[in-house]
Amino acid sequence: MKRRELIRTAFSTIVATAALSSVSARARSEDLHGLTLKKVPPDAIPKNDVPIFSPDDVFTMPEQFWRDFKGKLYIGKAGTDPTLPQNLIDVFVKNANGGTALLSQPIDLNSETLKTFVAAKGALWSASEYSMALHNDNDEQIFYVPDVKNNGVSEFSRRLSQPGGYQLIGEISSFASLRQTRPLFSGAKVRLKGWHDGTEVGGGAFVGEMTPSEDDGGYIASSGQDFHWRRVSDDMNRITLFDFGAVADGKKDCLPAVMAMYHWAQNNNQKLSIQFPAGRFFISSFDISAKYIRFLRLAGAPVNFGYFPATTLVSDGKSEFLFKVNARWVELSNISFEGQIEHSPNGQGFFHNICPAGQYFRGSCLRFTGVGGVSLSLIDTLDCKIDQWYASKCTGDVIRGSWSFTKKGNWDHNTAIELSNFNVQHCRQGKVLNLPRCTQSIIHNGWIEHSEFPGDLSNGQWIVDALSLEGCKNPLIAHCSRLNMRQTNLQSGSWIDNSLANDEWLSSFERGSTRVESYGIAVDGSMKYNYLTSRFRIENHSSQEKWYELGNIHTPDVGDSWEIEVFGQSQFSNGSGTKALMSVTDDRHTGGKAIINLQRKIHGFEASWSVEGSSPINDVVYTTSNDSDTRVFVKLAQWLGSAGVMIKTTAKDRFVTGHCARFDSRMVHSEPPKGEKVHSAVRRFSLHNGLAGIGANEQGDLLVESRHIDAAKVETSRAEGYISLVINGQQVAVPYFALKQNS
């Protein structure tokens, strides 16, 4: 059965029901409730006429219809206007006892005559094909059908009850048509096929009400008369721009739909969003910045991965920003914006919020491609988080933060910006992060690569966690900023400039930054700790000396110096006792350490060492297998309870250069190798100020150096006095002489 025939057949049941609601089975009355009935013999009904309505059909109509409806019904020749007298045809009423009457038209409709008709089991007879029109009591046409075919009613009812019967239900073709369609009764339901005629998006179920209401272009359909239709929705967040007439062809301007949905959300619940469905949408410019609002949500189709949002927006590049707002709280999510600068150079940005003195912004799953202006522009942020955002081939700033200088609240900076899970590639001219003066802010898991200007974080306070910069021509500017960085990845010459500059805004008493990496910690500031210890602990709980390999030193540059301190005391079980110390090498000390000094030469290394107190080691050996590497071995003293190893160097670390100095620890008991490239470090010590001092050499000599005095100036006739010394364990007296008075 063709769709048009199905609709006509369905209307025949509705119209017939409406007609007989006015007919009494007591056809003996010539006038009943305003109806005119003329008695006729049963054979007055033409042979080709058929029953077009019976009491059973009444129960197919909604109770709301026949309970409240009042109006007039016209039945005429098929294909004509039945409201014209010349087109009317005969309509007969036949009751269960065979009584027949001719019904005058138009037929007045009311609920009382319907009840009597049902009680009398009456039937309505007329031609099998006819036209009909139904008007309300204000003579307003509810519907008009030019060709009703009654003989399909039973077949239609049977097919409608089948599993696929839903396919037979009619739909209103467009939102414009819905506005003009009058509900049969309050609470009547219809289905809209599509917002635009010929489409199947933006449709849905609507409920009719017999009261006036203002049309909003998507949720309420109204022609301004005394009725309206309301969209059926169990979740307002599921309403999208399709429901307000947007077209996802990337060409038709969706601004009217965006404005309509925005006003609908503001009038119903400001926390509702302008919800884009999946697709490609063109928008010229959405500018509502002239009026302050509290809430604005702008969202695309839900996604979990911001790399490829299902909603793409494009524009013509003519406006400064695609979206310009003045809102305190903003949510922006699940949108890809293509600026199309590769096809048409322009300076259009994506989003700008001008609300001063505190903005709350939440962005997620955003992608910016080929944007000529600022992608995200914010001012006076108070709480801002942007997660899963991506940009490529942009020429404007990707994220920019500025301030309004509002006096109340001292708004000369931004606060609490968090940027997480982002990737930016191949951007030029503009800055990726143009965010100076941002305090209490965070960067987490971001990657900026092959971009001309990574950004400006100057005069800010940032926690930077897992930021990667690769192949960027210019540094990430962070002049005078307080940075706490961890796991920073700088590749292909990229770097962060955290130096001081002339425009310092933060307090000079709070200067400093830290950087924590797997290869080291860099602190630009003071360190305050409870105690200091080494990660290497050495022990020798035996009466025998033992060789121990500390590790390998790699230092690329000639002249680099290393100092290894082995801190610990041998002979831990015996204290210094109560006797005076008589031997610097053999007597017991409380405490001890050995200092090993190494320097990279043109070819290999040189080393010397000295001790203080009860030395934890008795010898040092090093190798020179190649110019830049040396292995260091120490002979542990017997009964070494514990010792720690501390290392210092002048060599370049990983914070300075990629090919940096390195200490590869071994920390195992191991005999040193043999051969000509194995050397014993000499035992040398000196303490001086460049003019005078003391020392000791590897031959066991004490070295003393002081200013020379001419003998003629010394009174040598007698000693002025004596001082006590212990030489090689023996206490002796050493005389000293005074200078002559005239000298």
Swiss-Prot record:
InterPro entries: P22_tailspike_N (IPR009093), P22_tailspike_N_sf (IPR036730), Pectin_lyas_fold (IPR012334), Pectin_lyase_fold/virulence (IPR011050). One of its GO terms (biological process) is polysaccharide biosynthetic process. The keyword Signal applies. One of its GO terms (cellular component) is periplasmic space. Coiled coil: none annotated. Keywords: Exopolysaccharide synthesis, Periplasm, Signal, Virulence. It is found in: Periplasm. Pathway: Glycan metabolism; exopolysaccharide biosynthesis. SUPFAM superfamilies: Head-binding domain of phage P22 tailspike protein, Pectin lyase-like. Residues 1-27 form the signal peptide. Its main location: periplasm. It holds the Pfam family Head_binding. To R.meliloti ExoP. Involved in the biosynthesis of amylovoran which functions as a virulence factor. May be involved in the polymerization or late modification of the repeating units. This is Amylovoran biosynthesis protein AmsF. It comes from Erwinia amylovora (Fire blight bacteria).
